[in-house]
């Protein structure tokens, strides 16, 4: 008996053979690795930024690379990060920026070639730093600018100093103003609001709370993009909300099994009334809502939380939300809402001009040097 192929059958067989061959080839593996996955990088600048990177490494983060940058060699050596870069080695001799943002800026500019190499091809870059010091305030805008020039969506995540740190506040205003110029969105954690959130904690522990909030926010956004979740956030959606988002604030809410009543309503109310979110969010341009819950979190609950926060915002606001399951959060729900396009006159918008203070550096000293010692990948 002779079996007759028709054209349609022949095409199907050929396509199947080609598909099977490609599935075993290096080409397909390359395509799977290089396409369809956003490259996310988290860069911590200065002492506070390094501490956030260290905390991220401690709690673990999937789908992102971490880079720690500092002028303080001693601090940098004890930080955990995928890559560590000591900047301004000939400028500061690894001893820090002395609280001068202009030194931090100059140190980062001396390292631009290395920064470009490390950030090339990144789709989303978080730049985290404490505003008001030297290295973070000065270097973070340079890092953000390099990332932006390489085509990434750049999200600054910065802390604003306590009022008792008077010498740092003016520098912080200058740093945030500069970050606002070079980032798509700048998320601000006001340390003064931490006093309302955790009023009885010693100040050193309050700093750790800020590290934890930033680390959890970055981890949450990253893993909801990169890791299969209950409800994934698409990178294109993140880009739409964060691109040109301006100044952003963050609201945090959490409920557990001991909370009485409707836990969905409770966590929505707690998130929007969070002391860190001390702005009029109703006129916000957009929001990114991240929900984490235990295995008992239902799809309906996640949807109701997303809708509950969305309805409180401007009807024209671009809102995206995602949800993921954490086996260790049985009975609990945590929500982080990043509200973009808000106005916070107490922090942003002051007319400030940075004072330029840079020690003189010889031409020989300013030449770039790279080597790996003491766990540091690059010394520049």
Swiss-Prot record:
Keyword flag Ribosomal protein: no
UniProt cross-references to SUPFAM superfamilies, sorted A to Z: Tubulin C-terminal domain-like, Tubulin nucleotide-binding domain-like
Annotated organism of origin: Methanocaldococcus jannaschii (strain ATCC 43067 / DSM 2661 / JAL-1 / JCM 10045 / NBRC 100440) (Methanococcus jannaschii)
A Pfam family per the record: FtsZ_C
Locations listed in the record: Cytoplasm
GO annotation, biological process: cell division; FtsZ-dependent cytokinesis; protein polymerization
Keyword Nucleotide-binding (UniProt): yes
Free-text function comment from the UniProt entry: Essential cell division protein that forms a contractile ring structure (Z ring) at the future cell division site. The regulation of the ring assembly controls the timing and the location of cell division. One of the functions of the FtsZ ring is to recruit other cell division proteins to the septum to produce a new cell wall between the dividing cells. Binds GTP and shows GTPase activity.
Protein name: Cell division protein FtsZ 2
CDD domains: FtsZ_type1
Matching NCBIfam families: ftsZ (TIGR00065)
GO CC, any one term: cytoplasm
MF term (GO), any: GTPase activity
Oligomer status and interactors: Homodimer. Polymerizes to form a dynamic ring structure in a strictly GTP-dependent manner. Interacts directly with several other division proteins.
Family to which the UniProt record says this protein belongs: Belongs to the FtsZ family.
Binding of GTP, residues: 47-51, 134-136, 165, 168, 211
């Amino acid at each position: 008996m002779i079996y007759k192929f028709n054209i349609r059958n022949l095409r199907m067989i050929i396509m199947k053979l080609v598909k099977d061959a490609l599935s075993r080839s290096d080409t397909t593996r390359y395509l799977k690795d290089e396409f369809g996955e956003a490259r996310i990088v988290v860069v911590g600048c200065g002492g506070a930024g390094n501490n956030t990177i260290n905390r991220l490494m401690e709690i673990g983060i999937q789908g992102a690379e971490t880079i720690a940058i500092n002028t303080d060699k001693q601090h940098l050596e004890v930080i955990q990060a995928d890559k560590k870069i000591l900047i301004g080695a000939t400028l500061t001799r690894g001893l820090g920026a002395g609280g001068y943002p202009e030194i931090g800026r100059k140190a980062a500019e001396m390292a631009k070639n290395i920064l470009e190499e490390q950030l090339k091809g990144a789709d989303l870059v978080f730049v985290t730093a404490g505003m008001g010091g030297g290295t973070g305030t000065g270097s973070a805008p340079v890092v953000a600018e390099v990332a932006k020039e390489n085509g990434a969506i750049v999200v600054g995540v910065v802390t604003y100093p306590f009022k008792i740190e008077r010498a740092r506040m003016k520098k912080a205003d200058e740093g945030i103003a500069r970050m606002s110029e070079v980032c798509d969105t700048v998320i601000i954690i006001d340390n003064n609001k931490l006093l309302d959130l955790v009023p009885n904690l010693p100040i050193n522990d309050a700093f750790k709370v800020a590290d934890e909030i930033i680390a959890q926010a970055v981890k949450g956004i990253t893993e909801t993009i990169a890791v299969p979740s209950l409800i994934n956030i698409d990178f294109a959606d993140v880009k739409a909300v964060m691109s040109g988002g301006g100044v952003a604030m963050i609201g945090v809410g959490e409920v557990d099994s001991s909370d009485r009543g409707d836990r969905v309503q409770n966590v929505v109310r707690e998130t929007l009334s969070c002391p860190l979110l001390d702005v009029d969010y109703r006129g916000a341009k957009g929001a990114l809502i991240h929900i984490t819950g235990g295995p008992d979190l239902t799809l309906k609950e996640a949807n109701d939380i997303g809708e509950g926060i969305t309805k409180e915002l401007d009807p024209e606001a671009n809102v995206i939300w995602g949800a993921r399951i954490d086996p260790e959060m049985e009975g609990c729900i945590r929500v982080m809402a990043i509200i973009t396009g808000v106005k916070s006159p107490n922090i942003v918008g002051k007319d400030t001009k940075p004072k330029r203070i840079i020690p003189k550096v010889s031409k020989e000293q300013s030449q770039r040097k790279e080597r790996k010692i003491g766990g540091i990948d690059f010394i520049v």
